[in-house]
Structures are given as structure tokens and as C-alpha cells.
């Protein structure tokens, strides 16, 4: 919730026309996000934070594409990925032609965000730097992102910036 609120502060709350949307798998974080919205005077009808797995059970399918997406997904977590062949037909992942490996979901989160992004929108996703250099399917997904000019820029961040991890991170900005 704090990342959504920070984005609204930068954009100006008056520019958040449709409201705040999100999805969180961790029930504690989900509840904290909702509480944070109330504590910052966001009316209940101005946010829709769903509980569930973003990659295997995405919410907000019926909503229009988003003009701004911010995300700080968990770094290098496991997911069904290439262990579930049906996911290659998912419209979020199919364009790249391959799935992120089941041992590392980083690029699956990036493809998910890209699929929800409006044509003139911008997404900023905090990532583990490994997404820049790992091979195999991840290299093919990166190539897809580059070939289609989706990557606007990459911002390298210092280590010890985020609570709970000492690793350096980066922000991938998609357009």
C-alpha cells in the first residue's frame, strides 16, 4: 500500500481518477495495505486491493488497462512457471514465447505488469538485478522486451535500501 500511496503523492492525488488497485498474496501484507489506505484517507470506494496469487489467479481482469503501475514483487521466488505448460497460453506470458523458470518468477511479474499497462502508460517494477543477466528463458523474455521497445530505462539502486533485504535492487521502467 505504501508504494501505491507514494506514487499518488508524486503524481498528485487529484490525478488518480479511477482509484487504487492491487493484489497481494500475503494475508498480513494485504490487511496492512487496506489499513494503510484508510489511514491515508482513501475512501473504501476508491481502492480495490485483492487477496491472492497475482501470477496464477490474477484479479481485475475486467478493469481497463492501467496508466500507472508500481510494483515491488518478491525477489526470485518460485512459481509454477515452466512446470505448468498451460501457462504459455496465458495472454500475459504468451507474447514472449517462453515462461519464466519455475525457480525465479521475476520476469513473470514484469510480463504480468506489462499486460495490464495502457498503451500510453508507465510501469515501474522493483527487481533483483539477476533479471538483467540470467540466461535461458529469462534471456529470451528480456530480448522480447527489448525488441518491442517496452523498456524505457533501468535504474540501479544501492544495497540496503529496502527493509528485509540487504541486496542491491533496480527499477525497470516499462512503457
Language model region names:
Residues 28-29, 54-56, 86, 119-122, ...:
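Residue-identity detector for threonine
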Residues 1-71, 76-78, 83-85, 93, ...:
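Conserved S-adenosyl-L-methionine
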Residues 99-174:
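Conserved Class I SAM-dependent methyltransferase catalytic core
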Residues 91-92, 124:
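Generic signal for short, ordered secondary-structure residues
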Residues 96:
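Conserved adenylate-forming
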Residues 86-90, 100-103:
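Catalytic core segments in nucleotide and nucleic-acid processing enzymes
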Amino acid at each position: 500500500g505504501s508504494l501505491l500511496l507514494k506514487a499518488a503523492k508524486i503524481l498528485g492525488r487529484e490525478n488518480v481518477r479511477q482509484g487504487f488497485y492491487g493484489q497481494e498474496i500475503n494475508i498480513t501484507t494485504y490487511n496492512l495495505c487496506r489499513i494503510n489506505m484508510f489511514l491515508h484517507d482513501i475512501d473504501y470506494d476508491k481502492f480495490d486491493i485483492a487477496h491472492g496469487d497475482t501470477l496464477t489467479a490474477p484479479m481485475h481482469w475486467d478493469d481497463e488497462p492501467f496508466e500507472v503501475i508500481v510494483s515491488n514483487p518478491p525477489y526470485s521466488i518460485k512459481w509454477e512457471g515452466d512446470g505448468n505448460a498451460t501457462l504459455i497460453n496465458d495472454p500475459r506470458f504468451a507474447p514472449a514465447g517462453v515462461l519464466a523458470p519455475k525457480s525465479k518468477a521475476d520476469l513473470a511479474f514484469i510480463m504480468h505488469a506489462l499486460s495490464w499497462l495502457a498503451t500510453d502508460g508507465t510501469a515501474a517494477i522493483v527487481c533483483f538485478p539477476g533479471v538483467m543477466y540470467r540466461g535461458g528463458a529469462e534471456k529470451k523474455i528480456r530480448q522480447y522486451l527489448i525488441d518491442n521497445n517496452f523498456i524505457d530505462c533501468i535504474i540501479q539502486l544501492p544495497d540496503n535500501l529496502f527493509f528485509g533485504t540487504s541486496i542491491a535492487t533496480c527499477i525497470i521502467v516499462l512503457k
